[in-house]
Amino acid sequence: MRQDGRLPHEMRPVRITRHYNIHAEGSVLIEVGRTRVICTATLEDRVPPFLRGRGEGWITAEYGMLPRATGQRTAREAARGRQGGRTMEIQRLIGRALRSVIDLAALGERTLIIDCDVIQADGGTRTASITGAYVAMVDALAGLRAAGLIDRLPVKDYLAATSVGVVGGVPVLDLTYEEDSRAAVDLNLVMTGSGEVVEIQGTGEERPFTRRELEELLALAESGVRRLVALQREQLGPLGVEVGAVVTEASGIGHQEPGEGAGVSLAPGGGGL
């Protein structure tokens, strides 16, 4: 039993609330336990210089944490005059993960800018950002299609991410900050709805780990991603059916009609997984 009462294979409660920001083309508040991230998607009718004239779009991301998202205040990076290495690493991860499931040619010469702002951190901020940003992105692209600017939703698959680790000698899913700080092995998995790997970030924090441990951790992480993808699909409702690959595995998620301001939640251990 973990400190918060979960079993090793259980996730924290997850809640996704769409249309959280009234101004953005797509927006989500994602809550994973006590971690909360606001994800917004903004469309611009231009592309970076290296893409001009190629007829393709681009997706980029920015990531940041509010000063009191953490236990002690962290100075704003703008006040320090530069971004930290961790911030740059995470926002590049978010951008390339989202690009992996989009038909950029079908987007046309447009840029989708994703902003992920952590308002409260308790572990898993980068994975929560990817999972929430995906939903915000789909909503923004659906608006583009509704305006007649593209003829179809250029989304090839679902996308979600979660963390796993070895804590106290036990493989566990969806680490809190406290668990992450004690983990002997720490791994993040970004995966599509059809089960293809987009990115694996794994580190032996205190010791090397075996291939068998790696395979066990990946299987555990995949089970978490599948639950998150099922939650995304439920939240997107009819729009989710249009995504290229549809996850058919039962999610065990209590149904709530998606819509403006509606949130859908995933309880820990939902669906008996």
Curated annotation (Swiss-Prot):
Keywords: Nucleotidyltransferase, RNA-binding, rRNA processing, Transferase, tRNA processing, tRNA-binding. It comes from the Bacteria. Residues 254-273 are annotated as: Disordered. GO terms for biological process: rRNA catabolic process; rRNA processing; tRNA processing. Phosphate binds at R86, G124, T125, R126. It is an enzyme of class 2 (transferase). Phosphorolytic 3'-5' exoribonuclease that plays an important role in tRNA 3'-end maturation. Removes nucleotide residues following the 3'-CCA terminus of tRNAs; can also add nucleotides to the ends of RNA molecules by using nucleoside diphosphates as substrates, but this may not be physiologically important. Probably plays a role in initiation of 16S rRNA degradation (leading to ribosome degradation) during starvation. HAMAP family: RNase_PH. Belongs to the RNase PH family. This is Ribonuclease PH.
